Amino acid sequence: MAHQNQHQDTIDSTEVEVWDSRTAQEVNKSLYPPAVDSPFTLNTHLSAWRWACTIILGTVLVPVRVSCIVFLLILLWPVAVLSAINLPTQPTKPIRRWRKHLIKSALVFLFRLGFFFAGFLVKVKGKKATREEAPIFVSAPHSTFFDAIAVVVAGLPSVVSDSQLARVPLAGKCILVTQPVLVKREDPNSRKTTRNEILRRVKSKMKWPQILIFPEGLCTNRSCLVTFKLGAFSPGVPVQPVLLRYPNSLDTVTWTWNGFSGFQVCMLTLSQLFTRVEVEFMPVYIPSEEEKKDPILFANTVRIKMANALKLPVTDHSLEDCKLMISAGALQLPMEAGLVEFTKISQKLKLDWDNIHKHLDQYASFAVSSKGGKIGIEAFSRYLKLPISEPLRQLFSLFDRNQDGTIDFREYVIGLTVLCNPSNTEKILQMSFKLFDLDEDGYVTERELTTMLQAAFGVPDLDVSTLFQQMAGKDSDQVSYRTFRRFALKHPAYAKLFHSYIDLQAAYIYSLPREV
């Protein structure tokens, strides 16, 4: 890869370094090989020696650090309450300049002190851009809730956050101070609303705070950079990449859907002598005219820049892939290969997830009308209103388990239901049950239940007979929806899956990536 243009040498050292699109033309692909393992899993093995050290240090450090943090929270409470007075949850104009500087300076100091008490040693590289230079920060890789350090180091810019968090007593007040872009999970139009609000702010002549976005949309294990969502890139304005590194011999901070729990992450991290973290502000990237019109190209170029600086590969995994890991294990493919394959095929077909969401009920009607029968590629094409093409054949083959040229369209609809409604467990259960209640009498059989569970939740190798007897009783050969729902919501085997749905609803991707 060619080096950055030499004109940077003439820029005053106090200015923020800038990349424009011309200096990125040479970047066609990452310098590093593609990722193979799934970025959504974490298998950390602690040796006996590590466990012993952690327990000994934790016995001393955790009580001291927790006491210091609690004391700090007592100080933070009145500051946060006073700061949030008269601040609306959906601001229409920026807060006054004097108030912004006074409040944020106090909060930044207290938050930095809190991370210090928790044992974090923060190293900052590069120079933060001004709003005029870059209205948006994009930070990656996103691997833990401790990544909030980037928000603090950046001076508490606005963040994209769940509207529910604004109601949390202390955290909600602190979030309101940043004038966040709040996302309503229950609103099917949340993506469009969020995108429009970001666009309104960055294009406004008013002095809105800069916005910091984690474009990956979910936590990974930092082994690669997954597909970037397009919210930060759709406005077509300059962005400043912000890199996050945790150069520690033992990784205690990573929080993925099947790794350490949030409580375990906190306890393990507080039990370390210290935890290093590096926050690096990269040069501002100015998009070309082509990239302004094509946010996918813009996002991929920035992602490759960041990956090369981190010496990490990029991968076609996306947020939808992580949902598929939980919901579509029945694809009968090696997990990592199946995820990337689905993303690539979806990209080629230009699947519009907003449009799919609107047509779910229609798809369900088609599936129910088939009464459990198989459909071929022609009917599949007709249902999706897509021409028969090689990408469509590839998508079809993912669900054609025995390669006989037919699929059960109901399973495809259940998979789409999970992808489009990750936060609505009730909707998923209702749709699944409806599709397999062939005679519409409110009951399903053991065989139908087996297929439904595999398609809806990706739970392979279930002892279905035992499970069915637990749900229906020994003398019953069918299960009602009420019985199924009550069992599914209470059974421990499903609790983690439902919890994962809640964790993964943080955002959706606006589009799917091009290959790089």
Swiss-Prot record:
Where does the record place it? Membrane
Glycosylation-annotated residues: 28
Which InterPro entries does the UniProt record give? EF-hand-dom_pair, EF_Hand_1_Ca_BS, EF_hand_dom, LPCAT1-like, Plipid/glycerol_acylTrfase
Q: Does the keyword Transmembrane apply?
A: yes
* Name of this protein: Lysophosphatidylcholine acyltransferase 2B
**Hey, which family's this protein in?**
Belongs to the 1-acyl-sn-glycerol-3-phosphate acyltransferase family.
**Pathway recorded for this protein:** Lipid metabolism; phospholipid metabolism
Q: Can you name the source organism?
A: Mus musculus
